[in-house]
Design a protein with these regions (language model features):
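Solvent-exposed loop/turn and edge beta-strand elements of beta-rich ligand-binding domains
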Residues: 1-458
Length: 458
């Protein structure tokens, strides 16, 4: 919607007024292109401060007007993309068109559209999604343009609101780094940061800028860098769109001359993490669940990475040592990124032989056509160990969904390759048995000599 003004009779107080550029009716006829823009801004300021009204012209509407010069201002902007209203412009009727006059004038306001883009920074790449272990740090980058308003614009809002889901812990110690090119903005001078923990576990961070301090950097825009850690409250799933989101909103003034004229841009990134349970069963009767088996989970580099599990109450807790199968034959390992993992049975259930070789499983996260993770994933036994197989998922009471790796044990006794008796035990037993044989042999030899001696005497 536009308003346009013509009558100079209503604007006598505008001319020769130092508050509005000290223009005269004669001087405005000699203005060049840039000076005309400045004149339009000052004239608009006068109209606002003196509450002058103009004729309204809606988008696409055609009005008949007298010949002359008009100040055209955008009073609202419903443009797609949340555009900022264009600055006031001077329009003449008619306009020169080649060698003739054009009396059918079309006004095309030049709205500027702010840009907001949020990414995860991973290995020097900017991505919308990532796969992480619980405890890993997720680095964020937000880039946004800075809207440009006319010089007399006041009370400009430029504010970011970042919402982290409960599975993300904001790193307050590191905080925000706010830059524009080589310029580093100062907290509490150029912007303020307010952090609030919500009842549902979300963290809401508000970054409010002093527009006067950043407007000179409109050409390069603004960049926010900050980070969070994936925590034990993270959503763990292998289904689409179930992840740990971080949303960003940019609220900004759309038209500084219209009360409460604000627009909002949004963007988000998502981090996914996975987990699996181990169900320990008898090799002959799979319905027989085995308690007391102890397992470790390591990545392909041999590092122990599974550090969280469910306790008996269904709460996510830190895993101390190995995972131990409960009365249902299950132990869980939570918060794992995609990749290969080695499951090693450290202690077998009572009455069962120890699993000889580790079971390697590979978690593969699905991606869409753009290369972004979808949240869906698959798991497979990837080293051919037939003692392990993938069965139906485990659904936890908190909504998390885990893969399920069923591992069989054979009844019987086995000696572990490390720990327990082991080879040392065999050596000790062999030495003891050999000692007994030697003693018996000596006793036997002594007895024979005694008998022979007794017979000789007789």
């Amino acid at each position: 919607t536009f308003s346009f003004f013509q009558s100079l009779i209503q604007m006598r107080c505008f001319f020769n007024n130092s508050n509005y550029g000290s223009y005269s009716q004669e001087s405005i006829q000699k203005l060049n292109g840039e000076q005309v823009k400045e004149f339009a801004i000052n004239l608009h300021k006068y109209i606002l401060e003196n509450k002058k009204s103009g004729q309204e012209l809606k988008d696409g509407q055609k009005n008949t007007v007298d010949l002359g010069y008009y100040l055209v201002t955008e009073t609202s902007s419903d443009s797609e993309g949340a555009a900022v209203a264009s600055t006031p412009i001077i329009v003449s009727v008619p306009q020169v068109s080649g060698d003739s006059w054009n009396y059918d004038v079309t006004i095309n306001p030049k709205d500027n559209t702010p840009i907001l883009e949020k990414n995860i920074v991973k290995e020097n790449q900017r991505v919308k999604t990532s796969s992480e272990n619980i405890g890993d740090v997720v680095k964020y980058e937000v880039k946004a343009s800075i809207p440009v308003y006319q010089k007399n614009a006041q009370n400009i809002m430029y504010k970011f609101t970042d919402t982290m889901s409960k599975g993300l812990t904001y790193d307050e110690k590191t905080g925000f780094k706010v830059t524009s090119g080589d310029k580093v903005f100062a907290k509490d001078t150029d912007y303020t940061v307010e952090v609030k923990k919500q009842g549902d576990g979300e963290t809401v961070i508000t970054i409010n800028f002093v527009y006067e301090n950043i407007k000179a950097y409109a050409e390069t825009g603004i960049t926010l860098n900050y980070q969070a850690a994936l925590n034990k409250d993270a959503v763990i799933s292998n289904k689409e769109n179930l992840g740990n989101t971080n949303n960003i909103e940019l609220d900004y003034t759309n038209n500084p001359h219209v009360k409460d004229s604000y627009k909002k841009l949004t963007d988000k990134v998502t981090t996914y993490t996975f987990g699996f349970g181990i169900t320990k069963v008898d090799s002959e009767i799979n319905s027989k669940l085995l308690q007391g088996a102890k397992f470790s989970v390591k990545d392909a580099g041999g590092k122990t990475v599974a550090k969280y599990t469910y306790d008996e109450k269904g709460q996510v807790v830190s895993l101390s040592g190995n995972g131990v199968t409960n009365s249902k034959g299950i132990t869980t390992f939570l918060g794992l990124k995609e990749g290969k993992y080695l499951i090693t049975e450290e202690v077998a259930p009572s009455g069962y032989s120890l699993l000889k070789n580790p079971i390697e499983v590979t978690i593969t996260a699905n991606k869409d056509e753009s290369g972004n993770y979808t949240g869906a994933a698959t798991i497979e036994v990837s080293n051919g160990n037939k003692a392990g197989q993938i069965i139906n998922d485990i659904s936890e009471n908190d909504g998390n969904i885990l893969f399920n790796v069923q591992i069989e044990n054979h009844a019987g006794f086995s000696l572990p390759s490390t720990g327990g008796l082991g080879n040392t035990g065999f050596i000790k037993i062999a030495i003891i048995l050999l000692s007994i044989v030697c003693v018996l042999a000596i006793l036997g030899l002594g007895y024979t000599k005694f008998e022979n001696s007794r017979k000789t005497k007789n």
